[in-house]
Amino acid sequence: MWLQHLSLKTFRNYKETKIDFNPKLNVFLGRNAQGKTNMLEAIYFLALTRSHRTRTDKNLIHFDEEQLHLSGLVQKKTGSIPLEIELTQKGRVTKVNHLKQARLSDYVGHMNVVLFAPEDLQLIKGAPSIRRKFIDMELGQIKPIYLSDLTNYNHILKQRNTYLKSAQKIDETFLSVLDDQLVDYGCRVMNHRLDFIKKLESFGRKKHFELSNQIEELSISYQSSVNITDKQNLSESFKIALEKSRSRDLFKKNTGVGPHRDDISFYINGMDASFGSQGQHRSLVLSIKLAEIELMESITTESPILLLDDVMSELDNTRQLKLLETISQSIQTFITTTSLDHLQNLPENLSIFTIQDGKAAVNGN
């Protein structure tokens, strides 16, 4: 798939911009704070209805406006798909083929993206919430039912936590009803995640072995607050975990176990990767990103769109060449950079856009 056209209206520092893209490589060139990353963020937001930089949607709206509008035309094997997002103070409206979508799971997945940015190194050493978000964003694109199950789980979780905080006297029967619903959707979420991690590890192990000159083996482990060793009895394991945590939950007035507390760990040759060198971290994250691309292709039969936010200068020659191999294949790529000096080996079929003060101008093909 590839993004043919993008229209931005009052998004970040873009007042109104319309731009047509190259199906292969697109380079956003400009000084810092001109809007290069904002352009990538717009593409990411159009795909996922979420920003990778802020949790507060109103930060995306131009400072003197009350709403924003994004639209794009995605080309896929099955034809063209127009996508639209309108964000106001009241919320967001999403449209596919000009038809309003009632649920997030009905919208996400029509345009798949893989983002690689310097902050992705936090995937290794950052907080567990960063890794959970990574799973949610990637898995949600290839398996829409996951977003539906996750939304339902979070709804029940919020209900349970609110009840724990507000109830003067706990009704054990009512709490058990909430627990049953939490277990139902929680097990679905965990099963989706376990399947995803297994596939990601398979692709990632191969990529990392190549990047490390056949000396490092990558493995990924899903760390759960629930006993996940026996998937057939996952529901029973979750119930037992909730029962054991009930006294703690009543005291702290929140839910201590479940997929909202889970994490993933990365290992290099059996050792915790968080203790590795910065070079190993870069290789590991690059391996994961390249694995994401192959995983998405294997499931959707479409190549995702690759977004590279100022990462080429962060990579050594070996890692750059590996990334360029991927770019040279049939995958649309967007790169932000302040200079073309370290992009000498890029494919010839590319478009360069100069970004200045929230405006984009084509200056090379």
From Swiss-Prot:
One of its GO terms (biological process) is SOS response. InterPro entries: DNA-binding_RecF, DNA-binding_RecF_CS, P-loop_NTPase, RecF/RecN/SMC_N, RecF_2. PROSITE patterns: RECF_1, RECF_2. Signal peptide: none annotated. It comes from the Bacteria. It is found in: Cytoplasm. GO terms for molecular function: ATP binding; single-stranded DNA binding. Transmembrane segments: none annotated. GO terms for cellular component: cytoplasm. Keywords: ATP-binding, Cytoplasm, DNA damage, DNA repair, DNA replication, DNA-binding, Nucleotide-binding, SOS response. ATP binds at residues 30-37. HAMAP family: RecF. NCBIfam families: recf. The RecF protein is involved in DNA metabolism; it is required for DNA replication and normal SOS inducibility. RecF binds preferentially to single-stranded, linear DNA. It also seems to bind ATP. Belongs to the RecF family. This is DNA replication and repair protein RecF. It comes from Streptococcus pneumoniae serotype 4 (strain ATCC BAA-334 / TIGR4).
